[in-house]
Amino acid sequence: MGKATVTWVQRLQFVGTDSTRHSVVISAPDEANGVGMKPSELLLVSLGACTAYDVVNILQKKRKILHHLHVEVEGEQQTSAPWPFTRIHLHYVIAGEGLSERDVAQAIHLSHEKYCSVSATLRPSVELTYDFELTADGEHSAP
């Protein structure tokens, strides 16, 4: 079972801590308090990290050599409170040795459909889409 705590620091700043005591700063998006991530964008980071973890793990189990992976996650929200996400798109940029488009597509699909708990949690109410870009070493764009 997952467990986390969120502790108020000051103004609209908080520290989130997981069960192994790793922490992240969370804050409001305005400049005065903007030292941490917005909670809604932390959700996007969580989704990207969850699926990136799976993709790397799956490809490494297939003995593929990865040189680079980053996931660009973009979410669309309703325009009124409580501003739920309605659609989230993930764009994977990946480079490595001996990677085929089939290998990458299969790893991403398995992550979203079988392994990523964040995807599974969001899927019933949020449209999740993804694509990927398989690049040669040194050709990937900066995150």
Model-derived regions, located:
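Extended beta-strand/beta-hairpin segments
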Residues: 1-45, 56-143
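Short glycine/serine/threonine-rich phosphate/pyrophosphate-binding segments
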Residues: 53
